[in-house]
């Protein structure tokens, strides 16, 4: 169950290095137009110290957190931001969508399978702080809007990511490869 925070908040979870697009995220959230949105950053990495020094009071660095803490942050966040420069298919996007969060992400990577632009989140260009900021502004206007977008295609994502269905699909593919007709 979700219990979103009363004020707009969002989450980034991942390794703090360039491929994740984290510097563009921090740049977006240091802009005065997002000072009312709390950004929680879970993870550690090479860029953390440098980016933390640039942060404004609305950016909170959590470091490495437990699975339970991650679930708690997913439960209270209005949305997830994953501004990757190139990810195969990040688990955090899948987890967020299964929990009913809208996601701001880029067109680079497999996560676009779970996010429909303008419907269940926003797909922004890579390396574009202004686009991240604009999408975050849209999602932070109203909790009702964020919740509504999060529920779009929610059941479809749950079905796609169901463990039984995933295992059955993999076994079926292996069977087809091993025993071609």
List each model region and its residues.
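Aromatic "clamp/platform" in nucleotide-sugar-dependent glycosyltransferases that forms part
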Residues: 85
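Nucleotide-activated donor-binding/catalytic signature segment of Leloir-type glycosyltransferases, i.e.
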Residues: 49-68
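A conserved mid-protein helix/loop that constitutes part of the nucleotide-sugar donor-binding site
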Residues: 8, 12-31, 41, 46-49, ...
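A charged, aromatic-enriched C-terminal amphipathic alpha-helix characteristic of glycosyltransferases
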Residues: 144-175
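Short alpha-helical donor nucleotide-sugar binding micro-motif in glycosyltransferases
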Residues: 64-65, 72-77
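Short hydrophobic beta-strand element within catalytic cores of glycosyltransferases
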Residues: 102-105
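Short alpha-helical segment that forms part of, or immediately flanks, the ligand-binding pocket
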Residues: 71, 90-98, 112-113, 119
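Conserved acidic donor-binding segment of nucleotide-sugar-dependent glycosyltransferases
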Residues: 117-118, 122-129, 138-143
